[in-house]
């Protein structure tokens, strides 16, 4: 058995932001995404709001300014190495959609119960207010292997 219980793929269940007793959903209550941890110390996360509109064009680097703005404000992505420390994990960000995160280390506090994972952030600014993120994940079902 792998001594690191984070290894694998996890599917987002909820992404909440807490400020005192106030709870908000920065990407909506129907946000979706995945976080993945590899056995050799790499991680990546992708989270998006539900119901994102398609661009009018099929040019992957195209889109109107309005389309790009909407897409950017409804998506979170970063990747890099990580360090598992039992009660917390440190994400050492090497690539990120939000450029200010590149080169930073982000702490996430861990609560793990079977195939359910809760990652909690220290306070950070979300929509102009200091909030703590709470991201609930469930282990993704193993993909069927082709015969």
How should each PLM-predicted stretch be described?
Residues 1-147:
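Lipid interaction determinants
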